[in-house]
From Swiss-Prot:
Protein name stated in the entry: Histone H2B.2
Taxonomic lineage of the native organism: Eukaryota, Fungi, Dikarya, Ascomycota, Saccharomycotina
Organism of derivation: Candida albicans (strain SC5314 / ATCC MYA-2876) (Yeast)
Gene designation per UniProt: HTB2
CDD domains, per database record: HFD_H2B (cd22910)
Protein modification: Monoubiquitinated by the UBC2-BRE1 complex to form H2BK123ub1. H2BK123ub1 gives a specific tag for epigenetic transcriptional activation and is also prerequisite for H3K4me and H3K79me formation. H2BK123ub1 also modulates the formation of double-strand breaks during meiosis and is a prerequisite for DNA-damage checkpoint activation.
Main localization (coarse): nucleus
Amino acid sequence: MAPKAEKKPASKAPAEKKPAAKKTASTDGAKKRTKARKETYSSYIYKVLKQTHPDTGISQKAMSIMNSFVNDIFERIASEASKLAAYNKKSTISAREIQTAVRLILPGELAKHAVSEGTRAVTKYSSASN
């Protein structure tokens, strides 16, 4: 019997969607390109900031740093979860792999809070979809 081909886990989280710039006809007949959309977590970061500190603002540079931080953490978690799925010979990343990855990546008390908030969010999502 021939040896099985080894499946490689995804090396990083899926890239952000960046649709190609579209050409639209302007009033004078010349072709004009629309700006390519860039997906960020800015609106969500802003909402959390207003929940915790309603009278505090955030600069564009600080928002950019926070967005990079969120992308970095998500990428680390996805990468670790992918490795865990590969170790267990699974082709799907489940909530269990994500939870274990969070426990491995985040330190001590931060991991405990992240796991409890994640569990709460999944429970809320599951009950809403039923």
